[in-house]
């Protein structure tokens, strides 16, 4: 299947490269390093070999989100975004860009997103989970009141916001003590991101800004399979709603969220996601360079779904969501 659009596809700059070093054994680091730093060569050859027309590129994790000084976070984000814009300009039919944002300061983040969309031609933002800020005693999650003006900007710009995982801080990760194998993409990434997404849904954010579009990777970070139970238990005792939002959690999930297949190449999982959120809200992705492009493409092209859904997920939904001309 040619013409696929992939949208959780990472790169690194020399400045952010080492943030990815801990995700593979030392012996595999040279390979991952090479993959992260390459954009124009091997990546494009693999795209050609496996029918990927366009990649939407994003900075590796946690990068900007782990820089506790907001001024330095902003400077790092701007350098990464300028570098990405230069790379996209070399092959604008093959690459598009997601903005990295200094979410430590909502006003700076809104300004940088506006710059990236209006001046650099980016199609949205990808943010690596919560942000650290040396002015705050707690991690910053984006349902907090100080972020609502930022979300107003996102809605006004009419671009998607990809909420990408990161590990919890050590102070919040005691449950993983002695079980480091559960950290990262094995489990902790999904759990951390799912809770963050639920915070957004329950906060009332989507009542105030109903046109927001949030993307979750890895087939929804486990959320599609929990929607019924979340709403069922919240409604079990007939009292005032336990969260500020006006509607059921599943309503926001189905109306404000999109999912990608990044790093979750399992047919049963895809079918379950289709049954929960619908094929119109699922998009193909690979999670390169942390997953292999051939694994993602070979699975997707042979998975047991209808050809109509394969076209939607493979490229049609992304074309519509990002307003891409083909």
From Swiss-Prot:
**What is the activity-regulation note?**
Activity is inhibited by 2-nitroresorcinol (2-NR).
* One cellular component term from this protein's GO annotations in UniProt: cytosol
Q: Where does Mn(2+) bind?
A: 8, 10, 164, 287
Cofactor names from the entry are: Mn(2+)
Say which enzyme class the record assigns.
Answer: lyase
Question: Domain of life here?
Answer: Bacteria
The record's InterPro entries line, in alphabetical order, gives: ACMSD, Amidohydro-rel, Metal_Hydrolase
User: How does the cofactor bind to this protein, according to its record?
Assistant: Binds 1 Mn(2+) ion per subunit.
Residues in the active site?
287
**What GO molecular functions are on record for this protein?**
carboxy-lyase activity; hydrolase activity; metal ion binding
**Which reactions are catalysed by this chain?**
2,6-dihydroxybenzoate + H(+) = resorcinol + CO2; 2,3-dihydroxybenzoate + H(+) = catechol + CO2
Q: What does this protein do?
A: Involved in the gamma-resorcylate (2,6-dihydroxybenzoate) catabolism. Catalyzes the reversible decarboxylation of gamma-resorcylate to resorcinol. Also catalyzes the decarboxylation of 2,3-dihydroxybenzoate to catechol, 2,4,6-trihydroxybenzoate to benzene-1,3,5-triol, and 2,6-dihydroxy-4-methylbenzoate to 5-methylbenzene-1,3-diol.
User: Subunit composition?
Assistant: Homotetramer.
What is the protein name for this chain?
Answer: Gamma-resorcylate decarboxylase
